[in-house]
Amino acid sequence: MPGRERVQALVAMVEQGKYVEAIGEFYAEDATMQENGMPPRGGRDELVEGERRMLARHASVCTLPGSTFVLEGDIAVIRWTFVFTHKDGTSFRMEELAHQRWRGERIVEERFFYDPAQLPRGS
């Protein structure tokens, strides 16, 4: 189970925009990630590639400071607020909860929950 400092370090890295690096540092080799209502995808290498593809689709992705989390045993829930800017200059804000199960110091399962009405049409 992670300590509060370990989860805080993840939050700090994501708030600095180091998304790909955070997966390498904090996710287990066999980790799975599941978007809102989608099937899970797995393996740290695939998660890194998925993150790179998401970042390549946008001009920028910013995590707003002030993310909060709850930690209970090996479960952490983090409230994230992101601003995605498309390559045409338009942007949208998205709030989500990330429910994580940790094994020791690494995330083994993560599932995202958000209101899809936040997403622009066609996303």
Region spans (language model):
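Short, cysteine-centered beta-strand-loop-beta hairpins and adjacent loop/turn segments enriched
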Residues: 60, 83-93
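Short, aromatic-enriched amphipathic alpha-helices that serve as compact interaction elements
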Residues: 1-18, 26
